[in-house]
């Protein structure tokens, strides 16, 4: 699946935008957010087996840009990538940019959450102020870059609630009694860090593309 790259036909190029993530939860949220744009949203899966980008940035924004540029070069298409994670005050901001692999390179939600609970136990707290943070970066084939950020503030507790969402959602309380994992998809998109960043990106893309 190739994308034309001539600057003269920029509008044609922009009708196809690759969502540069292999995370199904993120992909679903991003496809829904960009549904209102008259462009073709494409998954990385359409391009076969692609290597992972080396996410060695020190911030979410740096990692998002690394991924967007990497997959733009691999696919020849404009790309949108995000990097997001959890920052827990009692843990000095951890897991931060290491949220996806907090428990190691092959970590999953279960092992990452177990690691989170052990770290809270280590500092002898049952709950802590925390935030979810998302950086979203769009990179066009001509090098044009757009960037947005979203933040959702809450409390991390050592008691899980809810079956929805993914990542640390069952432990992330948006108020005293309700976690991100207990929200409907529509409710989550309204207040989540990624939902905020995506709405800002949609606005920027409307101005840029049309």
Annotate each PLM feature.
Residues 15-18, 24-210:
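Anionic-ligand binding patches
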């Amino acid at each position: 699946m190739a994308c034309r790259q001539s600057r003269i036909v920029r509008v044609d190029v922009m009708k196809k935008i690759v969502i540069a993530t292999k995370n199904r939860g993120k992909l679903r949220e991003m496809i829904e957010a960009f549904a209102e744009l008259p462009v073709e949203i494409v998954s990385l899966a359409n391009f076969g087996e692609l290597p992972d980008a080396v996410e060695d940035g020190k911030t979410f924004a740096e990692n998002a840009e690394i991924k967007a540029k990497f997959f733009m070069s691999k696919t020849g298409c404009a790309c949108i990538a995000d990097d997001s994670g959890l920052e827990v005050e009692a843990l000095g901001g951890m897991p931060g940019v290491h949220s996806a692999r907090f428990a190691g390179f092959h970590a999953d939600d279960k092992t990452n959450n177990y690691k989170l609970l052990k770290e809270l136990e280590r500092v002898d707290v049952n709950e802590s102020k925390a935030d979810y943070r998302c950086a979203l970066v769009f990179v066009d084939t001509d090098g044009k870059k757009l960037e947005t950020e979203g933040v959702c503030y809450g409390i991390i507790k050592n008691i899980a609630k809810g079956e929805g969402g993914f990542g640390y959602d069952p432990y992330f309380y948006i108020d005293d009694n309700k976690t991100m994992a207990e929200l409907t998809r529509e409710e989550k998109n309204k207040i989540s860090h990624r939902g905020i960043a995506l709405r800002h990106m949609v606005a920027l893309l409307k101005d840029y593309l049309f």
